[in-house]
Amino acid sequence: LALAEHYFGASQDCEDSILVRVHRGTGAGIISNGRIFIGRNGNVGEIGHIQVEPLGERCHCGNFGCLETIAANAAIEQRVLNLLKQGYQSRVPLDDCTIKTICKAANKGDSLASAVIDYVGRHLGKTIA
């Protein structure tokens, strides 16, 4: 995906870029001097298993508080669902708590959806920095 973005997308005029993808997991593709950077072990872009919350949720890798426990679609959906069940108000319906619905609500100014997306963004930013 980082190569496609480098050749055809927003970073095509950049020699160095990082594409971070949040989906089922969290990963990064790194372009350095116009070439994909893989690293010695081939896992340099595996940012999803960097521990960002030592007392956080258990990750499927066995560790606690990995970035993926915060910044992956399922984690975002679960966080919003838990908050809705606690009684927080939102445009996101309890029976349709999907990443698509959450993002649409955030774009329309929903305070709960926006707060969760902001929370995710802050953790992504700290990890990348």
Where are the regions that the model predicts?
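A mobile "lid/hinge" subdomain adjacent to the ATP/sugar-phosphate binding pocket shared
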Residues: 67-129
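Phosphate-binding/catalytic loop of phosphoryl-transfer enzymes
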Residues: 1-74
